[in-house]
Amino acid sequence: MGKKLELKAEKSERIVAFLARKVPGLSGAKANILVRNGEVRINGKRKKTNEVIDAGDSVNVFIPDELQVELPKVKTVYDDENIVVFDKPKRTAYDALPQLYDAPLYSVHRLDTNTTGLIVFAKTEYVQRALAEAFKQRRVQKLYRAVVYPAPEKSEGTLTAYTKLLSDKNLALVSPDSRDGYKTMVTEYKVVERIGGAAVLDVYPHTGRTHQIRAHMSFFGCPIIGEHKYGIKDITPPDGAPDSQMLAAVKLSFSGMKGGLAYLNGMTFETTDNFDLDFLRK
C-alpha cells in the first residue's frame, strides 16, 4: 500500500537531503529514487529533479512498499496527553521522530543527529509554547554524558565562553571574549571516570546554544571522542576510538512548571549512554 507523508520545509535545502533527514530510515539513495520516479510534490507540483526547496514549502511524498524503508528503533520513555519523551538513537534526526508517531507532535528542543538520548515533544501547539518557555527559563534541567580526550586537569568546573552561529554553515564560532553578535554560553562538567587518558563526564549546559557541548568542550581543549565538526586536528584520538561522537542526553528533570503542566514537577526521565569503553581499557 505504501505510505503517504505530508511534510513542511524549515529551511532552504535540496529535496533529497530534506527527505533523507526528515523520513526515518530513508537513505539519500532511496530519496533520490522517489524524486526521479515522481513520488514527490512540492506545493502540489510534481518534481522529478533534485531542486532546492525553501522554508515553508509543503512537501508531499509517497513511499511505495518496494523501497523497504527500515524504520529505526526508537524507545518511548514516557507518553501522556501533553508530551512524549523518546530515547533517540544515533544517526536519526530529531525532527524525523514525529513521523514514527501516530498523532501530530511539535518540536520543543533539539538534539543533534549523532547525539543519542532523551528528547521531548509536545502534542499541542499550546504545550509546545509552554515547554519552549520552560526550556528557555531553565525549568527543564538536562544532563549529558560525554567521553572526552584528553581528560580535563580539574575534576569539575564551570566554563564560560561566547558563541555565534553561522547559520549557512551550521557552525558555532567560539570566542573567549564578548563580541558583537556573540552570546554567552556556560557549561558545567564533572568527571565521572578517568580512563586511558580520557574522561567520562557529566555535562550540564546552563545555556542552550547550538552545538554548545561539542563546541565548548573542544574550545576548552577536551574534544568529544568521535566528534568531527569541532574536533582539534592536533589531537589524535585513542586507538580504536569510535567514529561517531560519544555524547548522550541521559537525564531530563522538570521543576517550576505552571498551570496544566504543573504535574510534571518532580518528574525525572533517565536513559543509559550505551558507550563502549573497551578501547580505552586496552
Per-range role (PLM):
Residues 43-49, 197-200, 238:
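Short alpha-helix capping/helix-loop boundary micro-motifs
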Residues 48-52, 202, 244:
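Short, surface-exposed secondary-structure edge patches
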Residues 76, 148, 188-191, 224:
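Conserved hydrophobic positions within beta-strands
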